[in-house]
Amino acid sequence: MASFSYNDDSVVVIIGSGAGGGTLANELCQKGIKVVVLEAGARQSPQSFVNDEWKSFGQLAWLDPRTTSGTWRVAKDFSGLPAWICKTVGGSTTHWAGASLRFQEHEFRVKTVYGDIKGANLLDWPVTLSELEPYYAKAEYKMGVTRTNGIPGLPGNNNFKVMYAGAKKLGYKEVHTGNMAINSQPRDGRGRCMQLGFCFQGCKSGAKWSTLYTEIPKAEATGNLDLRPEAHVTRIEHNDRGMVSGVVYFDKDGKEQRQSARVVCVAGNSIETPRLLLLSASNMFKDGLANSSGQVGRNYMRHMTGSVYAAFKNPVHMYRGTTMAGIIRDEAAHNPKRGFAGGYEMETLSLGLAFMPAFLDPGAWGADYAWWMDHYTNLAGMWLVGEDMPRETNRITLNTNVKDKWG
């Protein structure tokens, strides 16, 4: 791996090493461009991943304290941890389930198709699905997405078989094991999915696509990547012309460092990216970097979800196989006759015992709750995932009264 000088202002600095940062780093390195990646978390590996939900959460998740306010359910229910994002090399590609779906045509024209929705800040995209299709195809090929490019789908586990039987009985037609960035056959030097059942905890077989062991090692092999784990960025600096000139961060030993740069790419997820841009305010950019619109941090969106679990007569063992093992897409289209904008998809969701209390009946106790836990092997579960509307009031801001350990 390369090691560039702190004063080398010819490098591109990328903040974050996940789906965006890790992939961009490899693309630039392959073209001979020197890159420094600053990642706040530590570097793990398939060998160091832990097949234990609670221990893995401590290993991969971003656990730095958050503060929340307002009446949004997210602020009330998850005040200290409003989003499950990862602080590790590879970012949330270590944790994600691997579902890799394309936007639908109408989702590029939500302002036109949905019309005015009270409280929603809607815009049409400046590009169309047809314009993006070549890039979708390129990404799907690179990631080995199943059911694209002639790549077969993954096998369905018992949880999928339960959902499939019910879906077909109800008349649904588009029911399958999904478009997943998980190898269904050996590919790109990695083996096929071993159906271990701990997709959220990091893939120990390496079958699930993650920049941790795909893009980043390929970038390192070029000699153009300087990856610095446990580097917590605190601000981006600029010169008197308003052009970025460097990044200030704390290294793994807690020492403040400054890396010069000709270009800075911020790829730190939906919370850390706006926080860093706002933290980098200066006399020239009083409202933060790239924020002349005042929109940085606004329009924070999440999943709209609902879940259901049921106990069956015979064992299901839903925890075996991929966490998201199947999907129903018949309801994904926009249908205004239903009385709401956008669509939704139904997916299997196999959760381990450590997470079941939050999904079954939060706060439950006693014999009834114990019965569900005793019958865990007989449970099958699914959830639906819908579209959250962008609202300017749902936003990421800086807390001026509370500081983190970096000040």
In which residue ranges do the predicted regions lie?
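Conserved redox-cofactor binding core of oxidoreductases
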Residues: V74-K76, T112-V233
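Glycine-rich loop(s) and the adjacent beta-strand/alpha-helix scaffold that form part
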Residues: E27-Q30, K34, G41-E53, T222, ...
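Short, hydrophobic/aliphatic alpha-helical segments
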Residues: N7-D8, T68-W84, K255-Q257, A261, ...
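Beta1/beta-strand and adjacent pyrophosphate-binding region of the FAD-binding site
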Residues: F4-G20
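Conserved beta-strand->loop/alpha-helix structural units within folded catalytic cores of enzymes
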Residues: G16-G18, G22-E27, V36-L38
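Aromatic-residue-lined binding/catalytic grooves and analogous aromatic/hydrophobic interfacial grooves
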Residues: G22, G242, M373
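Redox-cofactor-proximal catalytic regions of oxidoreductases
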Residues: S56-P152, K313, V385-K405
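FAD cofactor-binding and catalytic pocket of flavoenzymes
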Residues: D77-W84, V89-S92, W125-P126, S293-G407
